Amino acid sequence: MKFLNRLTPVAMALGALALAGAAHAADTIKIGIPQPMTGPNTQYGDQIQAGALTAIETINAKGGVKGKKLEPILIDDGCEPKQAVPAANRVVNSGAKFAVAHACSGVTVAAVKVYEEEGIVGITPGATSPLVTDTIKPHYFFRTIGRDDQQGPYAANYIAKTLKPQKVAVLHDKQTYGSGVATQVKDALAKQNVNVALFEGINVGDSDYSAIITKLKSAGVDLVYFGGYHPELGLLLRQSREQGLKVQFMGPEGTANQDLVAIAGPAIDGLLVTLPADFTKLPGNESIVKAFKDAKRDPDGAFQMPAYAAVQILADSINAVGEDPAKVADYMHKTTFNTGIGKVEYDAKGDLKNFEFAVYKWDKDGKKTQL
């Protein structure tokens, strides 16, 4: 008994510390931001962090949400599917009930189950694979970007109606995102009676694509669409140019990385890429663009504005119904939001009812122009 009495002050002190910690935690609303911070796709994570942090800082400067500041929790997922569940679990363990979640589709497809099971409201500003929301039809998970079954047909329509090639090759990286969007393009081209002479996967990480380039030459294609990320496309562009294959290349938003010019060199000139429309030009976004620039962040990229919009939607929803994730998710499913990407409405699966893609052209210096 004396031993227990000696512990009582310690126990009381520990209890006081725990209560103080809980009180401190309750002073903020945590938002997990799991993104690629390492690996070859860090630029996508940088863009999403830039958008999310700018929105958080803007909202906090105006007093936060219901008197509480938003607290960003930065987590690295490496754009690696094997890191998906560990990264999502770090969001859970941080105490965050909300997340601006994951740039890469392969990661998101695996991680979305964690958010659904734990009741965490997640919004991805970057993952376009239909599998994200088709696999389990989540209630707690949403997007602020379109799907590949929107992006793929959009690209195919541009190819068929504007570029009008004689023969097309559709290549992909055999991964969730790349093969998915490539299949969407192939199927949409077939519906428009465009001749897809070659549909084939390449291996991620290979350094020599001479074999597939030889096949492209033999097939006599005049346009190559590649589904995947920039490292492989960069090598395909450079090696095709070096081996005398001068055809039009096109890809999805996952290829639109400034590191592409360092890999492809001058062969990047003329590359076409589908990306979200330039939301910096939307009427009413002048103050958002200024907030980016005041924070010395670039608003001009594929994912900055979708990430900014994700935070806006979370903040507006919490302000309306409180911090209960179930109520926030219910509110998001039935509400129209005014955001940095325009009006946002969700369907039953958390997909956007409308999203605008556009085609951009790259010059030899890696600068892009919306067509």
Residue ranges and their predicted role:
Residues 2-15, 25-371:
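Extracytosolic ligand-binding ectodomains
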Residues 20-22:
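N-terminal signal peptide c-region/cleavage motif recognized by signal peptidases
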